[in-house]
Amino acid sequence: MVKQASAWVESPLQMLCAVEAHHAGLLGPATEVVPRAGLRALRVTRRELRALTLPGGLELAAPRERMPSRVRAVGDAFSGKVQMRWLTSNPGRIVIVDDGLATIRLLELLAAGPYRPLLRARARPGRLRRALGLAAALRLRLSKVTVFTALPVTDELAAAVRRAGVDLVRHDFAWLRAQPISTQVPAERTVVLGTSLVRNGLVHRDQYLRWLTDLAAREPVAYYPHRREDPVDLALIRERPGITVHDEGVPAELTLRGLDPGQRVLSLPSTAITSLRVLLSPRGVAVEPVDVPEDWWTSRAAPALRSHLSSHLTGVTG
């Protein structure tokens, strides 16, 4: 009987990348992808993925409240629950899939040495949480770790990660690119990806809404919300003339891969820029990053964080 590997996923992107990791052969011949229960976006993404031809040996399990006792693949390496599972189960081999810009921070911490606690960029941990992050970092040093990513990684960082004993495997959504396109695309020429920067208190709401309003005054806009956008903000966006909000709840990589030549995607700093370029550039669709003007940032956005976000795109201002 073939032993089944488990992948624990907590976001739509993690779920998609777990499928890609299985397709790439990183998880063995049989994989069960287990979504965390209670998240509508995961339920919708699971439904959309099951409508496609999944790789052989892969099962998209029903959502569960609890993480499996042993997990081969995860997305959120900074999760306290994930780190506790690593410490209590001795996983041996770990595959970490993309989880947005947090993946880049993880690579930077792994490259910096074994005594850097695995903590989120804006975390203010207490002593116990810092100790858990440090213990998790040391556990990874004793395990075989693979980071599976579609994000751009500099040669310098990639070399440092590999010197630290971590395998870095790049991918270009090979499984998804091979799937037939059946989703209906928006009629609008311009598609805007929503952002979590406003809800996270990093970008001023008024400035962001003014930009959307000005953009929609020039042409109709299709707006695809970020899964963590504030419902109050979305209600305000829906009120703007010329903006159609498509509340899909699935990764942009799935929803927008069928855009037509001549359409374009605009986005504030987001890892979706990289993945959508992989999927859409061959179709003649422009994916245009939008630089965040200085007066958009709030005082909570420290200069280092602004640089970290902006360094992942070289763009135009809408």
Where are these regions (language model features)?
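Donor nucleotide-activated moiety binding/catalytic core segment of transferases
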Residues: 230-274
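Redox- and metal-dependent alpha/beta enzyme cores, enriched for Fe-S-associated oxidoreductases
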Residues: 179-182, 190-246
